[in-house]
Amino acid sequence: MVKPPYLLRHKDIAHISAGKLYIGDRRAFPETKRFVRISDPYQAADAITHGVTQGGGPLEVALMAMIFTRDLIRAGKLERTFATFVGVARSLSAVRPTNTTMRRTLDRLLSAYTNLDEAMERVEADVHTILAGFDRLYHRMGRLG
């Protein structure tokens, strides 16, 4: 596989650590490499709105925010309902109305679940499957030069 540049590495776009979601701050790059720390998924939507992440980053942040939502529900920090899970996805989809890829991807992710238990059990694996698909595309593009 072609090693992706900094701006395309998943851990540098968004990652979860110590109960927080960290989003790579594209506004500061290339002068500095820093992250914006997010405490709830609605802050992730605000970060996308304010340009913390750009290009394909909003989609990846939205996907990681769905895993983060699962984590917060497990920790009792968000209401344990399917409506909470779906509501986060809808709020993320709404922040960039012209980003139809983000909306379609989140809709496809949600359509796989009929209840909260399914979502909680499968969201992380499903998100990583989607990200692996992006990796394959980036690899093919990288081979083309």
Roles of regions detected by a PLM:
Residues 3-120:
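Long amphipathic alpha-helical segments
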Residues 102-145:
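Small/polar-residue-rich loop-to-helix segments that shape phosphate-bearing ligand pockets
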